A protein has these predicted regions:
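Non-heme di-metal
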Residues: 1-159
């Protein structure tokens, strides 16, 4: 028998602290700055397309795996949100003169994070890992990307 010694709020607070400590490792700007000079803004935006497509696909894969109607609807909303993000990035690339003809964001396969998330079967794990942790990682990286765009003088992409 497992004895619960923490309240739900204490668990959430501990999860947030642990997550914050781990995500702090992503914060140095050097983690965003490309080592390869070929990784310019357009290349970084194409990498963002991959991230958005993976977010679309993982949420879509989880819909038929859950029996909870509310979770199905939340995942469906997430699919739509991530698809909208994909379209916004796609449009910005076109404005920058980048042709996406023949571009496949998943041509190099799925990321290790996607593969891990795809293996989760428990809805609680999916929500914790997919919704909270993945979005927290995205928040850190998006903040860095915005700062990078501002430093390049590209206010439109930063917006």
């Amino acid at each position: 028998m497992v004895t619960v010694t923490r309240s739900p709020q204490e668990f959430i607070d501990q999860l947030r602290r642990t997550q914050s400590d781990l995500l702090a490792r992503l914060e140095p700007d050097a983690t965003l700055r490309p080592d390869d000079p070929k990784l310019d803004l357009k290349t970084l935006l194409k990498a963002a397309l991959r991230n958005e497509m993976e977010a679309v696909e993982i949420a879509a894969r989880w819909i038929p795996r859950t029996g909870d109607a509310e979770l199905k609807l939340a995942l469906a909303r997430q699919v739509g949100d991530e698809a909208r993000h994909y379209r916004l990035i796609q449009e910005r690339l076109r404005e920058l003169g980048e042709s996406l003809a023949g571009f496949n964001p998943l041509a190099q396969g799925y990321s290790p994070l996607f593969q891990y998330l795809d293996g989760l079967t428990d809805p609680i794990e999916q929500v914790a890992a997919g919704q909270f942790t993945r979005e927290a990682i995205a928040l850190v990286k998006n903040t860095q990307f915005i700062a990078h765009c501002v430093a390049l003088g590209d206010q439109k992409t930063a917006a």
